[in-house]
Structures are given as structure tokens and as C-alpha cells.
Amino acid sequence: MVEVYFIDHGNTEMVDWYNVKKLPAELREMPGLAIHCCVADICPLGVRWSPEAILAFKIAVVDKKLIIYVVSKELHKYIIEVLDNSRIEQRSMAKILSAAGHAKYEEVEPVAQHTGNMSDIDNETQQQFLGYINKDTSSLKTQQKEDVCSMEDDNSVPYSPYEDQFFEPGATIEVVVSCIISPGLFWCQNASLSSKLEKLMAKIQDYCSSTDCPYERGAYACLAKSSCDGKWYRAFITNNRPGSKANANQVEVLYVDYGITETVLVKDLRCIESELFDLKAQAFRCSLYNLIAPDSENPFEWDTKATLSFHRFVDSSAKKCSEFKCTFFATALVKTELSYIVDVFTPFASICKLLVELGHAKQLSHTTLAPSVQLQTYYYSMHDIKIGGEEEVYITYVNSSLEFYCQLSRNTETIDMIASATARVCSEVRKFELSVTPGPLCLAKFSDQQWYRCFINTNKNSTDAFFVDYGNTEKVNKEEMLPIPSDAYELLHFPMQAIKCSLSDMPDTVPSDVVLWFENHVLEKPLRAIIVAKETDGKLIVELYDGSQQINSILKTKLGWKSSRAEGSFGNSEKRNQLNDLDRGGRKETTSKFQPYSQGSKFSPDLDGHSQNGLTYQKPEFQTKEREQFEQKPNLRTPRSYNNDREVYQVQKNMSQSGFAPQKTGGFRSKDREAFEQRPNLKASGLYSQGRETPSMSQNSSYSGFPPQKTGAFRSKERQVSEHKQNSNPPKFYNQERKLSPQLRKASQNGSSSQTEAFWSSGSDQSSEHKPDNASQQRRSTFQESKLTPPLSKLSDLPKQNIALGMKSSVYVAHTNTISDFYVHIAQNTDLSNISEILNNEKGPSDQLDEKYVNLGDLICAFYEDGLYYRAVITEKCADGLLAQYIDYGNTSVIPPTKIYKLPPSLLSIPAMSICCALDKCTTSACEQNMDDLMLKFSERTGDLELSCEFVQYNNRKWNVILCDDQGCINDLFISVSGDPMLNPPLPKEPSVTSETLISASLFVWNLPELGETVEAFASAVDSPEHFWCQLATANVDSLAVKVQEAGEHSIHDGRFSAEIEVGSPCNVIYSDDNYWYRAAVTKMKDDKVTVRFVDYGNEETLQMEQVRRLPADIAAIPVQAFPCSLANFNLSEGCWSSEANTFFYDKVTEGLLEITVLHIQELGLCKIPQASVNVKYNGEDINCEMRRFWQDSFVNTNPFTESLNAKEETAIEDNVIPSQADEDDHSEPSEEPCASESIETPAVDGEVLTANDETKLEALPVSSAEEAAEITDNTDVELMRTEYLLHEVQKSSDLSCLELTLDEDVPDEKNSGTPAVTPLAAEDLCIDYDESNIKKSYSGVTTEMDNRELHQDEDLDLWTSAAQDQEIASSEILGDVPIDKECNYSVEEATDQSCTNIGLEEGPEPVENAFTENINDETDIANVQSKGEEEEAYLVPEESTVAECEIEDFEPEVDLQSKENEGLPDIPLLEGDGDDSVSPEEVSSHEMNEAEGLEDQDQELLGYTGTERAMDDYEVLQSEEQAEDLVPEEDPGTETEHRSYLFEAEEADLPSQEHKDFPEQEEDRVAEHKNDISEPDLQSKEQKEDLVPEEDPGTETEHRSYLFEAEETDLPSQEHKDTVTYTDIPLLEGGVDDFGSKETVSIDYNYEYVTEDVEDLDTENQESQICISGSDNRSKESGPVDLQDFEDEVLFQYTEPTADSASDVRQGDECEFAAHSDENIESPEHPVHTDSTADVCETDVCEPEVADHCHLQDKVVSERTECPVPDDRTKDDHQNNECQCAVDPVENIECQTPVCLVAADRSYTEYTWTVSETESGNMKNIEFQESPAEGDSVGSHGVGATEWKDGEPESLVNPDTPLLEGPVSVDIMHSSDNFEPETDDMEQMEQDQGRMKIESSYVPAPSV
């Protein structure tokens, strides 16, 4: 049978064991529903409750609806008042039971009724201490409860069930000021808990929205709905209780998390669930009281100016994102409300100082406290101590971890004043016999019978007094305490004189002998202290100097450490300015909930040590960020044990703590404090004297307190009483000379002599032997003795023997269990005899222990059967006694409970004499069968003999050893007995390695969270967003540090281990910054150096091989404390981080506690270290989302040729036939080259997939589907189309291992259709490592000839990207941005033998012309093309490229970049799809191409080209066939002209249908009005034509290239947008107006078709730009005005470039202003032409601030004559000042007559700006082209093609019938070789076409040299 407690019902029963089952995991987290309660204010009549009383209570409460009022909480029990509202008269259950005679009612008057003023000292003191009674935390039951009647009094303050936060004086935290009433009353929140508050608020909102739990009257804690924002908050009702009649519908509530008070309706209240009480009230009340005072007499009345200044200070600092810090100086009750006296400051200003400077406050001279104020703590002060300063101090108390208290020498006068005031007050108060228990501040009598100031902490079983001026804690009786009157301001206002300190760079645990040495050398003598740092609780980290000796260094030497600072460097400024980083592991201390103050602020607020009349702010010489310890160092001293023994001042409202008592946490146990979340403290050191034992605050402890026993008050070891009495440090007074009494001086000189004899002497016998004669002048030194027993020391508290790995020594075997478990003694050690002498002296041990106080692991003095006493450790409790092991011998025995004694403290500093060992290479399991024989031989060889022992390895608290005697190696016994020769290891010449094999980093126990789990962690090491390390907030590296340090100190260099070490090997290494040992894994090896990763922190370090030590397997098995992370959803193969990403990320994640959610885990590198892909949040902020703005996406597209093999949709080629153009031009034949269907998906080199490092971005691979295109387009906002050469970089470097390039498989070669080409990127964009021997296969898909060629490392490459490189170039921004090299010819080739989807485009609603062919000039050719594939795709192939040849020539990859022609090929921009065939212009980037044909690098220039877009549904460019005919160049018998045409076809993108049903009215009106009204402005005069005619050169070969752009309609802004629109036209398309580029709003999706035609033997004199309007067969042959409503679907533009090989002159248009009006003439300035003998540069650019277009023409062009036709009625020559004006009227045909335009010889390019403004008629926008000259030395010009829509669309772009202007464009002006006049008579016939037109525009590029 077992007894079980039903947590959901509260009853306990005995049940059968077999009826008990394991509770499912999902039910374990649910809290118990039953609440343990106790009725308040009643007690039983007798010892216990009678059965009648219990029955009466059951009848009264069972199965009834009751109202419960929680009065307080004691342990796990709630003290409640039970009300039964069903009763008419008395509703209190306590009073009902009392009236019925079943209980005794005890009523306590509330505190509020005892706040009157009394004149005499007795009444005044009585009143003060009655005010100290805390109804929440009292040791008496009557003080734990309130009267129900008093609760009904509106003047009393009800108890709040919300748990408050508590802060000790001196603490400094970061806060948020949440509510300001006045400088005397405001509310703050702990900033470190802001994330928890946000979670709670979200939980409250969800609870109130999903649950309707009405408020029940009588409860004070509730949820209230704020009238300000409608949200629900945790609230506490302060007055106008719902139960009262007045204001029954309204209550005043305090929002406990914000401090705001508001009156709300009762209907806006809800009941609060118990789980919402878990988080403490976040707002705490603060005041500047007694730091500064207002000008008024009332210290709490502040004027509005002061309050307003306070508000401004907070608001301005919040806007500047300054950290608000708060330092706590004291705690007080102000009108019964707990308030903290604080100062709020930023790194630059303090509110106290500010208000004084502004004249709103004054420095306060303390006289007395206000009657309504009762101090709960003494004031804290830094005593004007500066960080980095130097002070003379006297140490008054030392604890086991070398934490000590000291007094400043300069405060001696203050200490004497306090002593005098104490004596005076005691004499007065003792006249009155007060029955009131003193409050937390009182006077206590020390064992020297003197009174001292103390802070009282009342526990359940004892009362502890912390003497605030000396630092020690003692137990006192109630009779030994006196209250402090309120007028004793000297005692209340003088700050505490004991300053808590600790030494810098000290370990967590210190051996007792070191502590003893420290005490003997520092107590009662003046020392100098350098202040290194200040912790958050006010403790100072110091370096101590005794004269010229640095005590820190001496201690480190005794500890066997290397001193990090040189001894004797007392005045070293660097040392003084170096802040001791106490949290080097990167985690803020978990011992408190507030941030480190000294390391985070620039000012240290100090309270004046004497008058407290102001604050002094000292600026430290060094300032570090709050978490600046992320300096990538794995310091395991994190945090050091400086926090273990801190004195805690807290006002405790929790009744379980019973009183306002600060507790000094002994270093020997962990203590749960209300104000702090502590780390687990280190184990007992056993170094504590009886005089300074400190009780634990744990309510479950078997001992709630431990008595001082007149041994050293501040000693670490018990000593002889005579020494203890005089060297102990009780509270005391200093004389002016700081001299010790003769007795103290003598005791100090005696030190620790005669310890053995004095130990057993009674302290009480000698308590008065050396009592000082003058108590006011001497330091008192005896404490009152107590009868309770302190906890015993543990085995781990003993110091360790100094044994190093590989050490050889003479030993004796003391005890043997097995060959793998025996104990030895070091022969040279003589301490064993000393121990025996101390334990077995004449007196013997007298301090017998009670068995119930002895626990496992305790060290005791045990009596053995031989009649002697030995040191032992308890290993087990048995029925017949205690099983103990004798630590100095190794054997065990059962000891009777009556034979155990306390171990003398003097023996706690001596290590255990026995050393546990095992024979190396010998295991018990391997010789179990022969164990008896083996043990016999082992005992024979080892018994009572001195042996030679070599310590090989320390593992699991046991040394593996090799024993040898005069017969040889004893380890060989294992071999002789087992008979297995394979187990015979040769005796190593150097220290042997254990049998453990070298484990890899993958064998570490990685403590990673589960997938999907969210944990709290700190970033311990940050490399980048894709690689950083985190430590869990629950990680405990302290205990691990001790083991790792111990293993490292015992290790030696092992040559065998160094030979076996490899990448992934775990090891133990010393970190160079702090000389501590840390676990690490080897990540890289090079020569004699290794790079290791500190696995518990994440940072790396490179060190010498000999510095690496073997890591024991047991330590390697301890879970790793950190784990690597990377931000989720950022793939480096798809993008990269910007340069600011690392800095921003580091600042974000190192600020504080992070919330990390693990999404994916993968192993990294050879070390197999698991890395977590995580989402990171800090203070509710999503770091992943924040980092998105620093991410630059790159398109990783699939191969369109490979995609075509698996295409699921088939599109007939008949649907994509190019009409009429093939019929017209019969100059070339269709290409016979098939599409390279075998192209690889991933670029490869010699068969190996070409991979890249983290910076590599394969940006240009095409998108295989519309879905992928839309997805990529949505996720990127960076330029992916690059526009710069790498020619110089490739030429200068023969090393191709870091070639910046982008692989693109969109561009087919002329001869190898569909062959991928390569485009250079900027050097900062891409770096791909590959071997030069693999280049051929890397680009095997570029051309079929490359399989038979080789590229050598010392040769240059031309690497280009296809014209269809990325989707993004499809938008109008690209068309306005991308500079195209016009010298490069482009041909349209057919992707035969495969089905190809649209390149980089999303599939439209229906396929359009999508075939590519080469040299298609007739219907037969088109038919041939149609038969080659079911789904054909257009690809743009740059011509005359060294890699992707436009000519039908063999590919020559080995090219001299300085001499080869046509080095640069332009990328014709493609329009990318965005969802439904539309493109976001912002996501478009530009390509920059350059063709270097026969030119040197210095002669290469960029020719800007801006492909234009369809600006509206039916706004199309019309060109007549006659214009095309005029543009045919005259035949030149010496030239060979080749025409290549490029067709770009754009699909419809959610545009109105062909019939324009969406705009019927516009069609009717506009078509009728503007039909046949298109005139063709000529931009050149006849004089221009004559001058521009190129000279005939029979040796030249002219090559015409034509570019056809077919643009489809896209979703454009509505016609309401009528603002000015800026367009870019470089070059202008024929017809006067190009497609208009839209930068922001317009987005077009293009498909591309290519037609190549060769025109040979053309006369260059007759060359003209050719315009071909091709929507159908008949449409392409007619000319004249055409209504645009018949050309709804697409516009096809074709450019034809004539090229020649001979040098020629170029007339370049320098300035051009072109204005288009719907009802006005278009004026065109003349185009000056520049003549150059070396290169023909024709650039027309549009320049706007955002982006720029580059155009570069490198070849020479010979232009003989170019004419600009003008109307006959033009009589005025507009050529003035080199300007050519041309006006176009859409209603009338106007001819333009302009003279020849000349340009300066050095002009290389021109910039034009197009401006569209609305005309009076509103039919069109005025389009102005304004030239802006660029800098002469620029390599290219920049232009912008942007359409910015604001209020509405231009009507001309919306209406499908708005005619476009026809006429020559800037390209024709600058390149045409012959005259032409556009004719529009026949264009009327085009109305009947099917809505598609193609406009072919050609220009004459420069011939090759």
C-alpha cells in the first residue's frame, strides 16, 4: 500500500501499489486543481482541531458557492478569508465558527490604523515598529493575517496577491519608465523582462477574447479593460470596492504591470486565472525621496515644472534610444506602500542632477524622515569610489570564496560617529521595555556585549542579523535587539560602511589553505585596493596590494596558475583600466535578473558617504557595452563565484520568507533568494568557521540556520579559541590611529599556531580572557555561541594533490580492491602522520554528530575498530550504521552512529592522502577468470613495498598508472595471467596513451534543442548570420570549468597524441587570453599549427601543436554547452549578405536573451558538427525578418534547354510564325544549326559540377517556368543583370581560380543554338574556383566546337551572358537602364530539336510567336522553322562574339582580348514575368555589354541602349513599309552586308482584348478623331543627310544587323494617371516615339523571336533605317496613317545594322530635344555629328538620378550622307546653335527641314531627357527630349527610361486609338547612310490587321578595322 495525494481534489488515501500507474506526459504539465488553504484569523481551542469543529466546518462550506479572499501565502498554503454570501447576517466563516464555539478568533488591527504621531520616545518607537509589522511576511501567525472588518475599511490598503520584484540596495538594472506622477512617485519596469511581459499580454488578450469569465465581487486581483486602448491588463482594485454601496458600478484599479491607475466600470472586469499570477508584477514604485528634495517644504510635493522636466528627460532619452538605468539606494514604506529610492540615469545624464541644475530641486541635507516614510533598508553608497581608482581599505570579513567586506580608511570618522550615535540611542531606548518586535533596521548586541547596526532577517526558526558596517552575519535573540527611533537620523541615513568586494580573476572554489593564508595576511591591516569593476549588485572587483606585493598574484601562484598580470605592477594604468569581464562566456549572469551595470553605463552613481546630500557621478576610464564580453573568448569563469555569498537586502512579501531579512548566502550551499534567480552554487568547501555560518532561506532545509560558535567571525577555518577571539571580526569601532590592542596584535602574530591544542578547547571557557579594556577604541572579537550544528564539508571541498600527467613518484599501495581499483600513498608525503596526531591527541574529538544531520558525502571524523580516529566520507546509510570510506587509506567500514564526530577544520585544508588508481591497459573484464590468481600476485608484488609509479592518465577520478618494482613492471602480471600476448603493451618511453581511441567531434554530446522547439539562449560567438554559436540560458559551464581546468592542469604534452590528432579530434587547450583550459575540437591543421573551435562557446583560435592536450573521455561525454546556428530561410546559393549585415546582426543578437526556434539541423564539414537552422527573436523582434533587408537574392535558374526536354505543354510553331518579314527579305536561309538540347543543367568543368564558395552566386541561370519566375521575382530586389566588363581583370591575371562570372544558359550561339554563354560580373559579385584544365568542359555547352579546343591559363577568355539572362531585365526599368552595345549584331535563332519554355518569363494566357530562326526571309524558311519543334522558344544570340559567335564561323576560345574583335556583346534586355505575365519594374536590373572589335581597351566605349516598353494597352509605334524601303542602304560593290534581325516578342499580360472592350468609348472617339492623322517627323534635314552619307570604301564589308522587338501589352496604370511622365529612348525607334519605359508602374512580359537575314552587296550610300510594320502579310506592305486600335497585341521593332570593315567617320548627334504634342508640331534640334578616325561612337541617353544606361560603340562607321526630310512649307532653317528642331503634328503630315548638325570632335556620347506633359487637348502628353552632355572621360553614358505615374495615366497611353508618331529615330539620324522620307499614305490599310505590328528599325554600326 502506498499513500497518494490527489492533487486535483486535495484528499489523501492509501491505495494498492498495483493501482498506481505512470502519469502520461501530456498531463504532467497541467497544474493541480486543488488549492491548499487555511482559514485566516482563527485557531483551535486546544492543541488541535476537534472533530466537532471539523464537522461544523464541513457542513458550512462543502458543496457551496463561496467567496475566497487570499490574505497571504505560507509555503504551499494560502491563508484565506472565506465568505458565504448566501447568509443574511454574518458571512465570514471564521467568525461563524468562533461564534459557534468551535474556534478562537484572533483579530489583528491593520497597519493603517497605527500611523499617528506620538510625542514621547516610547510611543514614537512603538508606533514606528508597529509600522514595521508586515502583514505579508511575519514569523507570527497573528502578523500574517488581517481582520475582515479592517478589510472593509476603505482607508486600509488590501493585500495584493501579485508577487513583487525585489532589489537589493546597490543593484543597478536597465529599466523602462512606464508611469510618471511626480519625481516623488513614478513607476519603472525591469527591461530584461520585457519579452515575458509581451507574452503575458498576448496570453491575456487571448484569454479574454475566448473566455467570458465575469468578475466576482470581493476579489481584488482581476483583469481590467483599459478605456484608452481597449486592451486587457492585470489589475488590482485599490478603492471603491465592488462590495460597497457607493460607486457600485465603478472601481479604481492599478495596472500592476505599468503602474497606471484608472477608474473603470465593473462590467469591464474579468476574473483572473491562477496561471496569470506566475509572472511577478512588472511595475515597481520608485521615488527620488531623500536623494533630492523639492523647493517646497513637503518632500513629496513637486511642482508641475519639475514633473514636466522629468517627462521631457524620459521622452528625449527614449527617442535617442538611450539606455535607462536605475540604481537602488534604499527601500522604504511610503504611506504603507513599498517604494524604492532610486536614481534614474542614462549614460549621459541623471534625473537627480538634471532637476537640481534646472532649479526644480535642491540637494537634501538629512535631518529626519517624514512621518509617513519608514525605511526598510539602510542606504547604499559607493562612497565616491571610482572605477579604476585606488583606495586604502581595512578588510573586516572574509568568506570561503575569498569574497570579503572592507571599510575605507577615509571613513574612520564616520564609523566613529555611527558608534557614538549607537551608544546614545541604546541608552535611551533601553529605558523603555518595548514588547514590539523590531523591524528590519535595528540595533543588535554582539557577543562582546556591544550594540551595532544590523539588518534583521527573521526566519521560521531563527533570527539572523547582518552587521551592515562590518559584513558578518550572526544569530541573535529577540532580547538582543533594539529598535532605532525615527529621529536617530545618523543611524538611519548614514550608508552601510561595509563594502562587499572580491578579488579579480579568482576561481569559484579556493582551497582552504589558500583562504587561511589570505585571512592571516589581510585582516586588520591597511591595504591598497585598485577598483577594477563593479557588479550589478554593487560588489566591487578589486586588486589588493600589501605594500608592493600584489595579493592577487600571490594567490594565483599558490593556486598554480599563471598570473595574467605581472607582480608589482601596482601603478600600471593599463591594468587599472582593464575591466574584469565577469561573464566571459557571453552570458549575462543568471544570479540576478538585472543587467551588468558597471559594464554598461558610463557613469557610476555614488551616494555621498557622509551627508547623502546628493549623487556623484563618476565617469569610468573604460566603457564596455552591456554584452561586450562577446569578444569570442571561452572564459569558463562565467560568472565567477563572486555572487555566491552576496548579502541580499530584500523586502519580502512572500510569507514563506517571514520578514525583511537580507541573507548572506554561504558558499557551501545554494540558496533560493526571492530577488534573484541564482545559479547553482558550488559545493561546500568546509572552510567556514562556526562564527559566521549563515542560514539558508530554503524553507525545506532541515536546518534553517547555523549558529556562530565563537570561532573566527571572518575566518575560513576554526582555530584555537584564543586566536579566534582576538582575530575574529565582530562589529567594532575604530580608533583614529587604527591601532590594534596588544591582545589583538599578539593574536595576529600568533597566526594559526597551536591549532591542534586549541581546536578542542571550549570557546566559552575563553570567551572573556582577552576582552578589550576599552570597547569604544578596540575591535571586539567574540560572538555569542549557538547550539545548532552547521552543515558538514564535502569531499570535493578538500584540495587536490598536485599530480601531473606523466609524473613519476615512489608510492605505497594502501588498499586494494581490484587491479583496476586500488589506492596508493605518495612516499614523500608526511601529512598522514600529522593528521593522525591531530585526531588522536589526548583530548580526542568531543564534537559528536547527530546521525540525522549527517548526509551522504559529508566529511566526518570516524572511529575505527583499531581504536583510532580517521578522516572519512559517508557513502551510504545502513540499517546498522553509516558506511564510510576512509579517505586517507581507501578502505571502507560500517560505523556506529555514536562513533561519528565533526572533523576539525584544520584538517579540511589537507588533501586526501590516498590516490585511487588502476593499472594502465588492464581491465577487470578481460581477466575475470583469473582474477584470484592475479590479485594474489598483485598483493605479493605490492604489499608494504615502495614502488615506482608513473601516472599515465586521469580519468573519472582515477589515475591510470604503471607500477614497477625491483622485479620489473607489475602491469605485466595482467599479461602473464591472462596469457594473451596481444594484450601486452610495450612500456612507453614517454607517458603512455590510454586505450581510448581518439574520438571525433561528432562523438561530443551535442545539446541541441529538438526540431520545432523554442528555447532561450545567448549568442556566445558571432561570425556572420550564417554561422554563429549560442549557449542555452540554462547552460551551466561552471561545474564543467572545474573539471576541464583540473584535467588541463594534470596533463602534459603527449607526442603520441600529437601524432594521432586529426580534424575533428576533441582536445583540451589553453585559451591565450585568460590562460584557462577549455574543451575544443580541431577544425584545421597546417604544418605545426592547429585551429580549434571551443565547443562550449563557439569561437576559434589557432595555436601550436604542442599546446593541444588530450581530452579525457569522461569530460568529452559531458554535453556541449553551445551549438552552432544559422539564420533560417537564407540560402547562400541563392543570394548573399550585404556588407552591413554582419555588423547589424552582431549588434542585435549580442544585446541579451534570445528566443531561438530550431527549424532544421545538418552536419557541417569534416568535424560533423551539427548546425541548427533557426529563427531568432529578441524582445519579440523577429531577427530573421530584420535581416531580410540585408539579403541580396540571386536567381538560380534552371536550364531552359534541359527544361524543354521535359516540357509538358506543346505549342505549335504555326502559332508563332513571323508574318511578312520572311516574304519581304529573301537574303538568307534558315539556320540549319539545331538547338543544343544536350546542354547541361549545371555548369560543369571536366565532368565535375562547378560549385562556388559562400560568396558564389550563380545568378544568371534562366527560370524554367512562370511559377519559378514569379517566385524569384517576388523575393529579390537586387541587380542580377550585370553591366560591367572584367576584361582588364582577365587580361591582367592568368590565374582563373578567382574569376568573377555568372553562368547563363539562355543565350544560344549562332552556330550552336541554345548553347549557354557566360557573362562577366563585377569582381565583388562572384568568385568561382576551378582548375584551368577544366575550362573546356565547363563551357562545353557554349559552343559545340569547344569540345575540340582547350583554354589555357595564360590566355584570356570572353565570357558573356545570354540576352535572356534574367527575368528582371524585362521590366521598364531595365529597358531604361540597360546599356546595349550597338556594335554587336544579334541574330534570332531557332531552338530546334527541343521544346523550350519562355526564357525567364512566365507563361502568358496563350502562346504567341515564340520561334527563333536564323536568316528567315521567306515563307518557306518559316515553314522549315515551324517543323523543327512543337514548342519553340526564341533566344537572342549576340553576334561576332569570341564565345557566342554571331557569324557562321568556327568558335575560337583562345582570344587575345586586346586584339580580337567584337569582344563585347550586348545583352538584349528581356522582360520578366511576375505572376501573370507582368513584371515589377523595381525588380529589374540592367546588363551592360560591350563589343570590342579591333579596338584597344582604351578605345572601347559604351553605347547606351534602352529597350523601350509598351506604355499602354494599344499605344504602339507605327512605321510604314516605305520607311523601311528608304532605309535600305545603297549597294556598295566593295562591301558585303549581312543583315541579322532580332525579334523580341512580348506576350500579353492581362491587358484588354483586341477589341478593347474595356474602353469602348475611347475606341469610338479616338479612332474617328485620329485615324489617318499620323505624320512622320523627320529628325534630320537634307543637309544632315548629305553630310552623313558615308564615303564609299570598296574594301569595306558592311554588315547589317536588325533588331526586332515585339512588345506586348501589359497591365499599365489607369488612364486617370495624368502626371508628367519621363521616358527614355536610346536609341529612338523609328516613328518618332519608342516604347516607353516605366520604372515603377509599368511592367511588361516579353517573348523573344529572332529572325536572321543576310543582306549582301548593298550600297552603303543608300543605307537607311528600315521600318517594317508587320502584323500580317498585307499589313507589312502598306503604309500611311494607321489606327492603333488594330494593333493591340504586340509591336515588333526591328533594327538593322549595317557594318563595314573599313574606317569611317561618324557624325554623332550631340544635342537633341524632341517634343511631341498631340496637337502641336514636334521640334527636333539638329544633331551634330562627331567625326572620329578611330571609332564611331553614337550615344543617345536619357539620364535620371536613379539608374543609368550605357551604350558603347567601338567600331568605325563611315557615313556619307544622311538627310532629314522636312515639309515643303518649312521655310525657316532651325539649325541655330547646333540645334535641330522637328515638330510633329498627329493631324497633319509635316516634313522637317533642318541643316546639317555638327558636333565637337571630342564628344563621345550624349544624354537625352524625355519629358511628357499634357497638352491642352488632353489627347497626348508632350514628349520632350532634352540633351544633357556627360563627362568626356566617361566610358559610357547613363540613361533612364522611367514612367512615373502619380495622379493618373497619360491618356495617350490608355486610349488604344491614340496614334503614334512616325518618323526616323535617333538611331537612324546617327547611323543611316541615305535619305528617306517617311510615308504614311498606305498606313490606313493596317486598321484591318489582326492587331499585331512589327516595326523594324536598323542602324549602321561601325565597320571593323
From Swiss-Prot:
Gene3D superfamilies: 2.30.30.140, 2.40.50.90
Biased composition range(s): Polar residues: 592-602, 651-660, 687-704, 746-766, 774-787, 1663-1673
GO cellular component: P granule
SMART domains listed in its UniProt record: TUDOR
TM region positions: none
Keywords: Cytoplasm, Differentiation, Oogenesis, Repeat, Spermatogenesis
Distribution of this protein across tissues and organs: Expressed in testis.
Domain notes per entry: The tudor domains recognize and bind to proteins with dimethylated arginine residues.
Physiological role: Tudor domain-containing protein involved in germ cell development, more specifically the formation of chromatoid body (during spermiogenesis), Balbiani body (during oogenesis), germ plasm (upon fertilization), and for proper miRNA expression and spliceosome maturation. Component of cytoplasmic mRNP particle through interaction with FRGY2, and binds to maternal mRNA related to cell cycle (RCC1, RHAMM, INCENP-A, MAD2L1, HELLS) and a germ plasm specific mRNA (Dead end/Dnd1), it is proposed a role in translational activation of the maternal mRNAs repressed in mRNP particle.
Subunit structure comment from the entry: Interacts with FRGY2 (a component of messenger ribonucleoprotein (mRNP) particle) during germ cell development.
Name of protein: Tudor domain-containing 6-like
Gene that this sequence comes from: tdrd6
